[in-house]
Amino acid sequence: MYINNAFFSIVPGNEARAYAALGALAAQVKATEPDTWFYLIHTPDLDPGINIYPPPSPMQVAFVEGYKNREAFLKHHHGPNLTKFIAEYGPLFLNMYGPTSPFVIVQTLELEVGFIRPEEVDPNVFQVEARWVMKPGNRKKVKAALVDYVKAVKANEPGTYMYTVSFADQSKDSPAIPPMQLDAVTYNSAWKDHDAFVAHTKEPVYQDFLKAHGHLFVQAVPGSTMHPYMTTSVLKRFAGFLRKEAFVG
């Protein structure tokens, strides 16, 4: 599966129109793009007690997308649905070079290992993106470690509804904007609720993974192996869909 995380920013005052237009976009994608397996659109979760690193603007819109393959993503990315949406609604979004060129971050990823349960269709899931960085030269070791780790998450955490781990698209013509750090590791994950997320971070599966393999990742605390440096997004879904093909792993 090919995964894309993308971010737009709404110009203040245009929220209602933008959310309605984005909902219509998701419906059109669902109706006309069978190889788009999931297409989820969010605002940041800015509820009290939710920490996001770095803190986002409340005007941010975050897309979490999954495709049959890279070709399906490119078909969407350059296709009529998105092209028409930007032509009509581009002025609602922050832009640097005019209303038909909204400022966007595009993070294109190749799924390494993971699962998505059917419960992920619940729009109230606690959706999280976390981006770690491998230390140079450790890609093979990280790949091997992730297989058993993700299996253990699935087997032991029924409240974890999505847990996919992806590496950056390393092709020379990667459509990522800006180009991604090639040692990035991106977790797209979701839980039944915030409590299930907190439990995941404290339970043995995650803690044992850090103890055994944390040294393979860049650390936020010098000398530590238990504090991987990461940036995060915590999201509230307001539009989108998942097809049955999305339920992998």
Regions found by a protein language model. Name each.
Residues 7, 11, 20-28, 32, ...:
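N-terminal/domain-start segments enriched in small and hydrophobic, helix-friendly residues
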